[in-house]
Amino acid sequence: DDLYQGIQTFYYDSPEREINTERTWLNDTIQGKEISFYKSGNIKSEGEWVNNLESGIQTFYKDSKFNEIDYTKFFENGNLIERRIALVIGNENYEQSPLNNPVNDATLIAESLKELDFDVTLVTNVATEDELEDIIYDFGEKRNRDYEVGFVYYAGHAIQIENENYLLPTKEEYDSDRDVEKNGVSIQNIMKFLEAQREDQLNFLVLDACRNNPFGNRSRSGGNSNGLAKISTPSGSLIAFSTDPGLTAPDGDGDNSLYTNSLSKNLLEPGIPIEQVFKNVYT
């Protein structure tokens, strides 16, 4: 029928003539599996495709034995599908200085992100440092492997000690700076978990924190009465605070903080670039 059928193999222009790409054709269209190789012979990717490579799944492996997935990409009609994942945390049930709104705030943001096609994990009142670190680490691993956009939102107590910022789980003790450094979770370390691993990844960290000072005068640094310290932003990331560095943010008189209420509304405004969303929130 003069239709192209069979397997097409591409080679590197090298003495070893290692396979670059192998494709399967049916009725003049590329169908089925495509396998690509590194020059060393290690398999780089394996994809399942339909309609001349316009739609399908591409899986990248770390070695030629397909033992460990590096990351995956999804395509539809020739375009990369932007997959989105979010981790939303609300901590309010503190034994020292409980808060009123973080769980409501986290729930509101989670609902807004779901409307924007994010795969959302909502956790509330995370009790310990180990638990909070595990949640963030697991999220970072999943984001790096399967998603192009990562969004982390935190509402609750946070504090700076000597220009290092810490998120505070609900059931730890914070009677001194040493307690904070031991029992809090460093935001700077969190950014290492969340840093973009590929050029096509984008990450957001939103902190509606430093609402009041849970320590009184027990901390030599003044606790979070001085707000949070400025954070260096890694490549491919955007960090947003509910207030300027060095200042505190109110918990809010209603069901939600002023910042989160504004953020939720602006996230759902159609056609607004994400940078403009946060500018609108601050105004």
Could you say what each language-model-derived stretch is?
Residues 102, 123, 203-283:
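Active-site-proximal C-terminal subdomain of hydrolase catalytic domains
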Residues 92-95, 173-175, 212, 245-248:
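A short, flexible beta-alpha/helix-coil linker loop
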Residues 120, 129-155, 159-218, 257-259, ...:
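Caspase-like (clan CD) cysteine peptidase catalytic core
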Residues 1-81:
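Glycine/tyrosine- and acidic-biased, solvent-exposed loop/turn segments at the edges of beta-strands
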Residues 83-97:
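Short glycine-rich His-centered loop
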Residues 115-124:
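Short beta-strand elements in bilobed, periplasmic/extracellular small-molecule ligand-binding domains
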Residues 93-107, 252-255:
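Glycine- and acidic-residue-enriched helix-capping/strand-helix junction motifs
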Residues 106-110, 120:
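A generic structural signal for short, well-ordered alpha-helical segments in conserved domains
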